[in-house]
Regions:
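A broadly conserved amphipathic alpha-helix scaffold signal in soluble, globular proteins
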Residues: 81, 123-129, 143-146
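Short beta-strands and strand-loop turn motifs
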Residues: 23, 61-63, 105, 214-218, ...
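Residue-level signal for inorganic ion chemistry
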Residues: 22, 50-52, 76, 117, ...
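Glycine/serine-rich anion-binding loops at beta->alpha junctions
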Residues: 103-132, 244-258
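Short, basic/glycine-rich phosphate-binding loops at helix/coil junctions
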Residues: 56-69, 124, 146, 211-218
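ATP-binding N-lobe of GHMP and related small-molecule kinases
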Residues: 2-111, 130, 134-140, 166, ...
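ATP-dependent small-molecule kinase catalytic core of the GHMP/sugar-kinase superfamily
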Residues: 2-15, 21-25, 29-36, 134-244, ...
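Short, active-site-adjacent cap segments at secondary-structure transitions
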Residues: 58, 253-255, 290-292
């Protein structure tokens, strides 16, 4: 039995960080059509912001300018409804009338392989679990999150991880917290197209976590994406003139790592001066082994 939902009226703004896939291998395809993956997730300090304001009725409302995703398809709304439905299922004798306004400030580009939607969903689950005092553990929230998307659990758990399965089997990993230059070309990559493509490498040898440092960290989706989206290949070439560039997830974002913020910003200024990419989204961010979401959660529970 969980606690009775809270009736607090306080608004709070919670972070939803982006992530990078530092490597991505595919070791096979399952009977259900999904792929078995091995990937390394690390968070970066580039975030969406979600402000949660309790309502006096039971409506769940998303507020965001220039965001054309219908509410019924929005993963934020789906996450909020999922938490409430799960609570009512677990506590059938409880009256739950809590609603919420969710003001989204969208900074993470959509369809860029940075996990923005999954992160927004994870933040919604954790924030409303706190706001509504529904009393679920991180493990329980991660389980709920998996039904929303394979990347949601890593954002719920909040630690850099070596992931397997469809991305839900997570082992904590300690990584150097480098500075990253991230470049997002103006294209939305179809994840479905990538994973259905006949040219996709699906037979990588499985790697054990203890052997991870001995293997080349590559993204097997890169050849498929660059072949079908030349602008992603262009992004890799632009950064590649200064530092080794990789693609995150199924793209379209491309990144490179640096030891210092100054080094990353110097290269960023150089590539921004190139006319053909001056309108592309680009930024420098710090790699993080612990999610800003969990730092914020801890600040609320002290």
């Amino acid at each position: 039995m969980h606690n009775k939902p809270s009736t607090t009226t306080r608004s709070l703004t919670w972070p939803a960080p982006a992530k990078l896939n530092l490597m991505l291998h595919i070791t096979g395809r399952r009977e259900d059509g999904y792929h078995d993956l091995q990937t390394v997730f690390q968070f970066i300090d580039y975030v969406d912001e979600l402000e949660f304001t309790p309502r006096s009725d039971d409506r769940i409302i998303r507020i965001c300018e220039d965001f054309d995703v219908p509410e019924d398809e929005d993963i934020i709304i789906r996450a909020a409804r999922l938490l409430r439905e799960r609570y009512l299922q677990d506590n059938p004798s409880t009256t739950f009338s809590s609603g919420v306004d969710i003001q989204l400030t969208k900074n993470i580009p959509m369809g860029a392989g940075l996990g923005g939607g999954s992160s927004d969903a994870a933040t919604t689950l954790i924030a409303l679990n706190s706001l509504w005092a529904t009393g679920y553990s991180i493990d329980e929230l991660a389980e709920m999150g998996l039904s929303l998307g394979a990347d949601v659990p890593v954002f719920v758990r909040g630690f850099a991880a070596f992931a397997e399965g469809v991305g839900e089997k997570l082992q904590p990993i300690s990584l150097d917290e480098k500075w990253y230059l991230v470049l997002v070309p103006p294209v939305h990559v179809s994840t479905k197209m990538v994973f259905e493509n006949l040219d996709l490498t699906r037979d990588c040898s499985a790697i054990k976590l203890c052997d991870l440092s001995r293997h080349e960290w590559r993204n097997v989706c890169t050849p498929v994406v660059t072949k079908n989206y030349p602008v992603v290949s262009q992004a890799i070439d632009v950064i590649g003139k200064y530092s080794k560039a990789k693609m995150s997830g199924t793209g379209a974002s491309v990144f490179s790592s640096f030891d210092t913020k100054v080094q990353a910003e110097e290269v960023l200024q150089k590539i921004r001066s190139k006319h053909e990419i001056e309108t592309w989204i680009s930024f420098v961010a710090k790699g993080l082994n612990k999610s800003p979401l969990h730092h914020f959660l801890e600040s609320q529970t002290r």
